[in-house]
Amino acid sequence: MARTEPVQPHAAAVFTPSVILSFDVEEHHRIEAAAGLSVPASMQTEYASRMETVTRRLLDRLACTGTLATFYIVGEIARSHPRLVADIAEAGHEIGGHSWDHRRVHRFDARGFAEDLRITKDALEQDAGCQVFGFRAPTFSITRETGWALDVLAESGYVYDSSIYPVRHDRYGIPDAPRSPFVAVGPGGGSMLELPPVTYRMMRQNLPVGGGGYFRLFPLWVTQRSIQQMIATTAPPVAMLYFHPWEFDAGQPRLPLKRISRFRTYVGVKKCYDKLESLLNTQIFRRAIDVVAELHDLNGPLPRFSLGEGVHVVSARITSSGASARPVSPARSP
């Protein structure tokens, strides 16, 4: 299988318009809509098996199209499916953290969140044989109420984050956050390079069209047009898409969810794989870490966005309090 090679520094500060493909990998019953449900052990076992099956199917399809992606994986999968994590990394994809068991940031205090970040990062790095640079909070749960998480992240060894969605939503979102890459600053002054998901700007509002249920609900052209708008109108021109392996499992047993949650969770699942197939055949994708490496070579500043008081001056170059070195693409240990 292909091995990921380090990215070399760019001589020119010219940024390549980029579309990032990412997957948030958790088992079917770990989704936020199922929080608090009592899921039988037999169903959990089936979901674990189906998660691996559909993830490997996605890996095969990505290999056929020569596409590299970023996989944000919950730590418990590193424990239960270590070979899967290793195979994702061995195929050249980036491994990122996605918490230990898909708990939202709101359910932690700072100490608990720091420990969750640590054990997840350690477990993934052990299986993948390479460093983990990126993090995405479950359900994009870094919001104004949990801005303190940026201070914790900045001291955790991660280089970038993809947890802030610049939209209005009942579960997440900071609607006035920048739509393109920016430096997010926590109330304690910790800063992280932030890669937000795709939005579509219309009537002074950001519409959430970057993946998940929105991708399943809307026609494919909505996603395609949103990518075009992001590349044409934002700077740096970056469009981040996100999906979940369970969304490509049309035959999965349904969880006993309430009506609205059931609709949000399962709408469009049967057509999701075909829509992704169309994107893979028409769009060139990159890993998040490769975009981050290129952003680090830019000479100009990125927008700064504060989630609290006590903000220190953020360098014009992209740095974070906890990981200021320029990242290279993760390479597996020999």
Where are these regions (language model features)?
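Surface-exposed cleft-lining segments at the edges of enzyme active sites
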Residues: L207-L217
